[in-house]
C-alpha cells in the first residue's frame, strides 16, 4: 500500500548476538498490573534461527525461559512445532545456564513501561539489549501464554497457574 517504515539499525549486546547474530534476539517480559503493583508473569528469550533475521518462533525462531533472579536461561528451547533444543541449532550454544546481559535492567524497564498505559494491564514487552542498555521493540497486548508453558519450559507441569493463582488471589 506504499507504506514503509524506516528505522535506525539496532546493534545488540555481544552476549545476545552470540546466540544468533543474524537476528536481534529479544526478551519478552510479560507484565501484569494489579492496582499500582506490576508483576512479572514470565520472561522468555526469543532467538532467531538459520538465515532469518526475525526472532519470532512463528518465523522459525525458538523460545526458552529466563530466570528473573539470575538472568540465566533456565530451560531448553522449543519451536512452534514442539521440537526441543538443548543447544542452538546454528551456533551450538547450550541454552540452559547461559547468562544473559542486563536482565534486571530490562525487567525494571518493562515495569516502568507497564505503568505508562494504565488501561492495558497485561502486556508482553519485547525488549532488546544493546551495549548501552535495554531498548523497547514493541508491546503486545496479547503476548500469548501457550508456547511459553510447554512441558520442557515448566518441568513441574504447572505452567503459569501458581503465578496467576497468587496475583489474582484465587483460593
Where are these regions (language model features)?
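Short, well-structured alpha-helical interface segments that form or flank functional binding sites
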Residues: 22-24, 105, 122
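A sequence-composition feature that detects small, non-aromatic residues
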Residues: 9-11, 17, 41, 77, ...
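Solvent-exposed helix/loop surface patches that form functional interfaces
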Residues: 66-68, 78-89
Amino acid at each position: 500500500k506504499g507504506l514503509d517504515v524506516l528505522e535506525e539499525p539496532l546493534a545488540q549486546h555481544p552476549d545476545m548476538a552470540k546466540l544468533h547474530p543474524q537476528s536481534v534476539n529479544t526478551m519478552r517480559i510479560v507484565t501484569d498490573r494489579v492496582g499500582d503493583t506490576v508483576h512479572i508473569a514470565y520472561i522468555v528469550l526469543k532467538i532467531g534461527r538459520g538465515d532469518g533475521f526475525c526472532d519470532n518462533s512463528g518465523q522459525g525462531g525458538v523460545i526458552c525461559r529466563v530466570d528473573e533472579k539470575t538472568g540465566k536461561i533456565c530451560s531448553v528451547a522449543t519451536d512452534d512445532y514442539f521440537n526441543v533444543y538443548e543447544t542452538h541449532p546454528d551456533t551450538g550454544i547450550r541454552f540452559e545456564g547461559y547468562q544473559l546481559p542486563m536482565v534486571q535492567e530490562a525487567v525494571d524497564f518493562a515495569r516502568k513501561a507497564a505503568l505508562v498505559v494504565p488501561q492495558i494491564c497485561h502486556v508482553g514487552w519485547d525488549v532488546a539489549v544493546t551495549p548501552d542498555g535495554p531498548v523497547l521493540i514493541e508491546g503486545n497486548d496479547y503476548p500469548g501464554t501457550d508456547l511459553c508453558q510447554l512441558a520442557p519450559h515448566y518441568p513441574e507441569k504447572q505452567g503459569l497457574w501458581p503465578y496467576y493463582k497468587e496475583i489474582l488471589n484465587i483460593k
